[in-house]
């Protein structure tokens, strides 16, 4: 049954067409655009004469079925027209403020929707929440403040798809991601005019955003090149037009500097792959664990944990690895800013991703040309230019988008990429190097950093543990090109000798951490290299495990860097004796970690124990580690030290007991001179019976017993 349309008075909104002209969707009523009347008078005449409009067979009408009357009246046609234009016209009337205070009429919705909504981000959210397509609104929305809105805002408030604009609404196909079926969402032409003044500022910004977002993500998905984004499923809701993006996101997110700062905080949560230093090294045996912890239960737990870690290598998980990768799929403007942050810090812990990156870089020629590797010829040229624009120029379309790489790479980390080749590093050296501050190849035995990665003079941290190709020639190259070097981790680089350390100490005065520990070829590092590091650098952390470090080199280190030393790792330095470590500890007041595993010639542990207790009294707990022999000697030395302290306390008590009694100076009692017998079971058996000392002890014991009875008689709270 066709719902009846309420009568309208002269003040109703239908009479306002004399003041405002609405270009109605006449194609839905009259068929093809050729049959559309030129004015409302022809429309009235055709309806009054009863002529039926010519309907195009290629485009079926989406109107509800006409009533049984063969000649519809003007009122009925107006009701149908109002039901069609309700979604957008009611919004225009609510914004312009030309609606009477009367209650708006209620119209029945059409029998079928006007058009299928485009699969945009908003449409997807509505469909997910409501379980269907976006419903037609039957009542006008509340009034909106028009001070901050222009025509673009009004057009998006209507029932328009993201492809529609106030000027035109073409029927555009929407291609899904690679591997999915292609679907088309058809929209009907809709156009209207408004008496509101258009804001030129909004139009200018909209045109600029359009210019940045001309290119579609379809090019990336259809490309045959092997690239990390080629297999990414890019949904259609993330590739909407400029009008849809500008209407859904906040204005602040369209400002390049603000967006860059926001994404910088996202990037700050990403953990760089690294090997965290252990709080304590694993015990060598169960007895060693018992000597360390002093408790059987803790010792068993530590030993079981050590066995488990030895059998199953740890897989370090780094959180936030894909945080910025999701930002790449928002829109093209976010893609450019996110990519800039990703290239600022390059780190890989997966061999497959590293291979893809090398393949992409070799195909495009440089990481800056990442956007051009899949462009087709009909798009505008994005060739690399000499100037480097800022983000404002990128957003406004005043410069080429591939020149975004104004911030060079500062971090380059390869974490356990054992199959990395030297040819790959040589290919990327001039594209990544030049401004590196952190360079790390962790257990990459087959590669060594080339000169291009060391150039620029900004390198501060170089970590190359397990790189067997690092030698003295490489250290001389580092010394010449990295004057600001502060951290040099060269563990298991067994070709490094004193010559390389001397060159490094002469050109890198800011060096604070040096680790040249090794298990083989320890004779290459001796007094000459350690002495040069101690004299010419600011080293506070030294790792020389397995090296031929002697007592003289330790005195050099204590003399020049004593109070600045923080960590000393001397495991396996068999040349160290009691003439070095026990004697230099008073000069190293800030020492926090001391590792002496395998230093079997050190037997004077009293000085080490006194140093440890001195640090603990000042609320500093140093970590002193050793092997099983070292720990057993430490425990024995601690017991002997406790016995010595007990003897001193007892000796002081005996001296106080035999001191002259000032209260009874007139009474002189001949005291028997005795020597305390600590081997006796009774420590007071040597005191003569009936002497002043015995009376003092009896009085003292009486006072102690009375005080204990007094405390025991007090009620407990």
From Swiss-Prot:
Residues 90-104 have a biased composition (Basic and acidic residues). The keyword Cell division applies. One of its GO terms (biological process) is cell division. Keywords: Cell cycle, Cell division, Cytoplasm, Mitosis, Nucleus. The keyword Cell cycle applies. Residues 38-74 have a biased composition (Low complexity). Residues 1-26 have a biased composition (Polar residues). One of its GO terms (cellular component) is cytoplasm. Residues 1-149, 697-717 are annotated as: Disordered. It is found in: Cytoplasm; Nucleus. It comes from the Eukaryota. InterPro entries: Leu-rich_rpt_Cys-con_subtyp, LRR_dom_sf. Belongs to the AMN1 family. Negative regulator of the mitotic exit network (MEN), required for multiple cell cycle checkpoints. Required for daughter cell separation and chromosome stability. Involved in copper sensitivity. This is Antagonist of mitotic exit network protein 1. It comes from Yarrowia lipolytica (strain CLIB 122 / E 150). The gene is AMN1.
């Amino acid at each position: 049954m066709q719902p009846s349309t309420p009568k309208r008075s002269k003040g109703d909104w239908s009479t306002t067409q004399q003041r405002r002209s609405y270009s109605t969707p006449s194609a839905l009523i009259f068929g093809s655009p050729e049959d559309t009347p030129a004015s409302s008078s022809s429309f009235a005449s055709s309806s009054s004469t009863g002529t039926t409009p010519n309907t195009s067979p290629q485009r079926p009408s989406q109107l509800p079925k006409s009533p049984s009357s063969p000649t519809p009246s003007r009122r009925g046609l107006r009701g149908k027209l109002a039901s069609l234009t309700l979604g957008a016209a009611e919004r225009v009337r609510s914004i312009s403020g030309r609606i009477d205070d009367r209650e708006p009429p209620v119209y029945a919705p059409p029998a079928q929707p006007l058009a299928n909504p485009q699969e945009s981000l908003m449409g997807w959210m509505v469909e997910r929440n409501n379980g269907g397509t976006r419903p037609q609104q039957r009542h006008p929305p509340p009034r909106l403040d028009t001070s901050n809105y222009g025509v673009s805002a009004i057009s998006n408030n209507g029932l328009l798809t993201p492809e529609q604009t106030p000027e035109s609404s073409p029927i555009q196909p929407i291609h899904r991601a690679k591997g999915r079926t292609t679907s088309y969402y058809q929209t009907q032409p809709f156009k209207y005019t408004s008496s509101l003044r258009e804001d030129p500022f909004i139009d200018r910004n909209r045109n600029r955003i359009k210019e940045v977002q001309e290119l579609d993500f379809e090019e990336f998905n259809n490309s045959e090149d092997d690239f990390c984004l080629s297999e990414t499923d890019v949904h259609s809701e993330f590739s909407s037009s400029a009008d849809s993006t500008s209407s859904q996101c906040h204005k602040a997110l369209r400002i390049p500097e603000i967006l860059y700062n926001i994404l910088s905080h996202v990037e700050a949560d990403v953990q760089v792959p690294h090997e965290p230093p252990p709080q304590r090294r694993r015990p060598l045996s169960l007895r060693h664990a018992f000597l360390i912890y002093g408790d059987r239960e803790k010792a068993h737990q530590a030993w079981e944990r050590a066995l488990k870690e030895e059998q199953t290598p740890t897989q370090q998980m780094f959180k936030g690895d894909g945080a910025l990768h999701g930002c790449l799929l928002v829109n093209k403007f976010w893609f450019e800013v996110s990519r800039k942050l990703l290239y600022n810090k390059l780190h890989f812990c997966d061999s497959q991703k590293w291979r893809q990156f090398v393949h992409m870089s070799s195909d495009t020629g440089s990481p800056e040309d990442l956007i051009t590797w899949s462009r087709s010829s009909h798009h505008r040229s994005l060739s690399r230019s000499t100037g480097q624009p800022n983000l404002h120029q990128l957003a406004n379309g005043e410069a080429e988008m591939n020149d975004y790489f104004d911030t060079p790479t500062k971090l380059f980390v390869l974490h356990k990429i054992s199959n990395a080749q030297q040819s790959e590093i040589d290919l990327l050296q001039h594209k990544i190097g030049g401004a590196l501050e952190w360079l790390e190849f962790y257990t990459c035995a087959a590669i060594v950093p080339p000169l291009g990665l060391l150039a620029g003079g900004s390198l501060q941290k170089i970590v190359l543990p397990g790189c067997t190709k690092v030698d003295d020639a490489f250290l001389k190259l580092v010394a010449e090109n990295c004057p600001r070097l502060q951290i040099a981790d060269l563990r298991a680089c067994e070709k490094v000798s004193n010559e390389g350390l001397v060159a490094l100490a002469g050109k890198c005065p800011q060096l604070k951490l040096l680790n040249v520990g090794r298990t083989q070829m320890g004779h290459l590092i001796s007094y000459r290299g350690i002495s040069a590091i101690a004299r010419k650098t600011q080293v506070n952390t030294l790792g020389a495990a397995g090296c031929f470090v002697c007592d003289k080199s330790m005195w050099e280190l204590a003399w020049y860097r004593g109070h600045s030393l923080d960590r000393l790792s001397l495991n396996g330095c068999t040349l160290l004796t009691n003439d070095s470590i026990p004697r230099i500890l008073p000069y190293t007041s800030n020492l926090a970690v001391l590792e002496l595993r395998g230093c079997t010639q050190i037997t004077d542990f009293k000085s080490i124990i006194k140093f440890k207790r001195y640090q603990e009294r000042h609320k500093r707990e140093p970590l002193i580690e050793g092997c099983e022999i070292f720990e057993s000697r430490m425990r024995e030395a601690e017991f002997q030290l406790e016995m010595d302290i007990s003897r001193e306390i007892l000796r002081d008590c005996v001296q106080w007991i035999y001191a002259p009694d000032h209260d009874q100076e007139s009474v002189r009692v001949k005291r028997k001179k005795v020597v305390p017998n600590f081997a006796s079971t009774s420590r007071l058996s040597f005191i003569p019976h009936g002497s002043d000392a015995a009376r003092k002890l009896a009085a003292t014991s009486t006072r102690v017993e009375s005080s204990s009875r007094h405390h025991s008689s007090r009620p407990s709270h």
